[in-house]
């Protein structure tokens, strides 16, 4: 059965074999920054949060997790680059495994979407460019709760890039040490890898800029390095070719997306082993009329983008972005996605899978509590339809 044909017998609640992982359903916890890891170290609150959202055979992706001390752009986001962090993550992973779930760690470097307060010695954030994120729409959240404009970044020298690639590789190894089932490379949403991919940001004239192939080079090196470190079956990749978050615009999102897919397919062929999945965020033009930076779009443009990437990719395809139950069911039944990840709905509904199955009423999420440090309110206190049990 091809992706284009779909399978009307498959639903969000059908089992799925994602490489070496036997999943009991297609509903995935999307990676979401929550700012509860005080001083970058996971704690019992994170273990409770992820355990609440675990189902037997379910698949979870952790929040964006720092690969180095200077890779953060939010307060109190977890890291995976120190022994202390690795040990602290073990309680989170063990809580998920105790419920019968699988969990990948999302490896994250925000690049220019940072501030001196998050940088060692108060330095400038790094990027593909020295152009700052525009101040007309975007602000960076500081530890004191204030929002200020993004500073001018420092463009990485080509000679520095291998060290950044190594940060991803070491973090991947650390994630496996912590017990994670694998990792997801965050190449989306205007963060460091996306700052190389998008021609609206990347103004380099060396081997990392200009052509699409050059702009894909950094992602290619990260994927190659991480696959070499932990194996392809434990590696997922997330991209968002048509998402304009943090000024991450591209003149031809479809061609960029297809170039990334082609590069990943080629790597899989050379390696002889498939990646765990490709995770693509779609723009939802039909829901919002435009992407975050104001670029207009249409249903047809969105459908062409997602279907083209789905058909081109040789492996498990995961979609995210504004899905409800009905849209998720449609995506699976029509063959547009193997898996669907949910974000905000999962924040407010830790038992989202159960609610979807019985068409239960959904809790409303509270945006004001998305990025606080409270270990309970807006984090682990959303009600269940039935009492929660960790076992």
From Swiss-Prot:
Optimum pH is 7-8. Active from pH 5.0 to 8.5. GO terms for cellular component: peroxisome. It is found in: Peroxisome. Disruption phenotype: Male sterility. Fertility can be restored by exogenous jasmonate but not by 12-oxophytodienoic acid. Large petals with altered vein patterning. This is 12-oxophytodienoate reductase 3. The modification N-acetylmethionine is found at residue 1. It catalyses: (1S,2S)-OPC-8 + NADP(+) = (9S,13S,15Z)-12-oxophyto-10,15-dienoate + NADPH + H(+). The lineage of its organism: Eukaryota, Viridiplantae, Streptophyta, Embryophyta, Tracheophyta. Its EC number is 1.3.1.42. Substrate binds at residues 186, 284. Pfam families: Oxidored_FMN (PF00724). Coiled coil: none annotated. Induction: Induction mediated by wounding and methyl JA (MeJA) needs COI1. Seems to not be influenced by salicylic acid, cold and heat treatments. Induced by infection with the fungal pathogens Botritys cinerea and Alternaria brassicicola, insect feeding with Spodoptera littoralis, and wounding.
